[in-house]
Swiss-Prot record:
One of its GO terms (molecular function) is RNA binding. It is found in: Host cytoplasm. This is Non-structural protein 3. InterPro entries: dsRBD_dom, NSP3_N_rotavirus, NSP3_sf, Rotavirus_NSP3. GO terms for cellular component: host cell cytoplasm. Residues 334-402 form the DRBM domain. May play a role in stimulating the translation of viral mRNAs. Pfam families: Rota_NSP3.
């Protein structure tokens, strides 16, 4: 402990010597004794904060402990000697780094600022007021090593759309930390729709943005005027820009338009798009259950494949539900699926199960389930895959007498 005590003594003596020198300089300059005491008190506070904030004090104490351990055990002494020999060439740099940290701390640049600056950079687009925060390589390395955790601050006053975007961001961060591919599941939905034959740009943009932000977007005020009015420039690209100006939480990383240099690459992988039909009509199309569907002025239809994409969403977005399909089941009652699975396990029966999708008369989705085991087979319809499968399972159980 002798070396450690000596280091602590050196820090104390250094502080005392510096304070005495400051007091003498103040008096020599004609300053009062009270003023000198005030400055010295402030100096001591700053001195302690600086040596603690920079890590210099802890680093010196740590080395002193190493020396004390080496003095207690000769084997540790040899190892310690090798360590200092191998690092002799960088010892001067280590000292200079400590001095720079002290200078930065005294300039008001604290540890939090240094850490943030070492891991993140801020990029500002020319002509834009918004900023983009970029991860530096140091931050990426720390995430890979599990040493850096990123969390998003929550606030109950946030809108539903913003809360959905925060949850999406947390999913992306979690996937990034675990080295997984980023996938965001979305519900396809319409925003506010006006069926007047002239509002297809607003309708398609409303569906596109509502689906991404996870909340139906209100498009018109009480008088029927568009909230995101773009005048004569009626194009989904301009409407999205207007939405961003009005702080709708959709970001440049969420989509690309056909003027972007990487548009073709995004278009190949995207599952959600705004498509122009004959340069006079716009619809929102999306991929669901390996088939393409569209919202055409709010009406759900199978997509024919005609048209040219104007705007495409990031490939991380995947549609796993259509909001108007009635996919949420309430009080389904006893579950034949569990009974059928028990029979499969108990008797070793093989079950074939396939699903199909058709449109009902009102434009909503109907799921069809074909199920067969042995000579028993059933076809059932439902508002969801699970509902259709449950009905088919009940039919199969009745046929095989269970």
């Amino acid at each position: 402990m002798a070396t450690q005590a000596s280091v602590e003594w050196i820090f104390n003596i250094a502080g005392s010597a510096a304070s005495a020198s400051i007091a003498k300089a103040i008096k020599d300059a004609g300053g009062s004794e009270d003023f000198a005491k005030y400055v010295i008190a402030r100096f001591y506070d700053n001195y302690k904060d600086s040596v603690d904030d920079t890590g210099v004090y802890n680093a010196c104490i740590g080395r002193a402990r190493t020396v004390d351990k080496a003095l207690d055990d000769s084997r540790k002494a040899e190892r310690n000697e090798d360590w200092h020999t191998n690092l002799e060439t960088i010892s001067r740099l280590d000292l200079e780094l400590a001095e720079l940290k002290l200078i930065l701390s005294n300039l008001g640049i604290k540890r939090e600022d240094r850490v943030l600056n070492s891991m993140f950079s801020v990029v500002r687009e020319e002509g834009k007021s918004s900023n983009t925060v970029m991860l530096k390589q140091n931050a990426v390395r720390m995430i890979e090593e599990g040493k850096l955790k990123i969390r998003v601050e929550r606030n109950e006053n946030y809108t539903a759309s913003l809360k959905n975007k925060i949850e999406e961001l947390e999913c992306m961060i979690d996937a990034f930390e675990k080295g997984k591919e980023i996938i965001i599941s979305l519900d396809a939905m319409n925003g506010e729709v006006k069926r007047d034959g002239n509002s297809c740009s607003y309708n398609s943009t409303a569906a596109f943005v509502s689906t991404i932000v996870g909340n139906p977007i209100k498009m018109y005020d009480e008088s029927g005027k568009p909230l995101f009015d773009v005048g004569d420039y009626l194009n989904p690209k301009h409407i999205i820009d207007k939405m961003i100006e009005n702080e709708i939480p959709i970001f440049k990383s969420d989509y690309r338009n056909n003027e972007s240099p990487d548009f073709d690459v995004w278009n190949e992988r995207s599952n959600l798009k705004i498509v122009s039909i004959n340069d006079c009509h716009a619809i929102c199309v999306f991929k669901f259950e390996n088939a393409w569907w569209c919202f055409d002025d709010g009406v759900l239809n199978k997509y024919s494949g005609n048209g040219n994409p104007l705007i495409v969403a990031n490939a991380k977005f995947q549609i796993d539900k259509i909001l108007i399909s009635g996919d949420v089941e309430l009080n389904p009652g006893p579950d034949p699926l569990i009974r059928l699975n028990d029979c499969k396990t108990k008797y070793g029966i093989d079950i074939i199960c396939r699903f199909y999708i058709v449109l009902d008369n009102d434009g909503s989705i109907i799921h069809m389930c074909y199920m067969r085991t042995g000579s028993a087979e059933a076809v059932a319809k439902g508002r969801s895959k699970k509902e259709a499968k449950r009905i088919a399972a009940k039919d199969i159980l009745d046929q095989i007498g269970l």
